[in-house]
Design a protein with these regions (language model features):
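Jelly-roll (double-stranded beta-helix
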Residues: 1-136, 141-195
């Protein structure tokens, strides 16, 4: 079935609860969702920049940018071509290219995760997305199991999974995993599909 929920029954937020409605810190929460419409022809990347305050971050927004407060920072998340840069701020990462179909409307769904050590997605094949999923790890580590191999990332690193890949995610190491997440999904479909 594809009820739009990630298979995280033991994880507060289920990746759908808005971060403003969070009752406890651990979990997966939506921080923003932005309809981008049809995307341009050039390859796209997820640009992650931080600013000293939210007002400055808001003033640096581009057409496909959102400002998110999370993990103690004021983030400017932007979907743009590789050469794009905001005025000022600190460049944290650029993840991509994000492979998408041209002339297809997409929505950028951003999430924040705080996952204790030892977390594993429910047994079974996991979930998939109708578009690429990208992570930037602020702290801790994660392991992503797919039929195409296992990927790992640790604090300061990013990870990218293409559209449609079945995946199951787990925490790696003994530190709480803190990450910001993007699912750039086809607007006509739920952002997540259980397998």
């Amino acid at each position: 079935g594809s009820d739009g929920r990630a298979r995280n029954p033991g994880l507060p937020g289920w990746c759908e609860t808005p971060v403003a409605d969070r009752k406890v810190e651990p979990g997966c929460y939506t921080t923003a969702s932005s309809e981008l419409g049809a995307v341009p022809i050039e390859p796209l990347y997820w640009h992650l920049d931080t600013f000293p305050d939210r007002t400055t971050a808001e003033s640096r927004r581009a057409a496909r940018s959102v400002v998110v407060d999370g993990h103690g920072k004021h983030w400017l998340f932007t979907i743009a071509e590789q050469a794009w840069r905001p005025v000022g701020g600190d460049r944290v990462a650029m993840v991509g290219p994000l492979v998408v179909d041209r002339d297809t409307p997409y929505t950028a769904r951003y999430m924040e995760t705080v996952i204790p050590p030892g977390f594993q997605e429910g047994r079974g094949p996991g979930h998939r997305h109708p578009g690429p999923e990208a992570w930037f790890l602020v702290a801790g580590g994660q392991c992503l199991e797919t039929p195409n191999g296992v990927m790992t990332a640790r604090a300061g690193q990013s990870m990218l999974a293409p559209e449609g890949w079945p995946m199951a995610i787990a925490s790696l190491g003994t530190e709480t995993r803190r990450a910001v997440v993007l699912v750039l999904h086809r607007s006509s479909q739920p952002y997540v599909q259980r397998i």
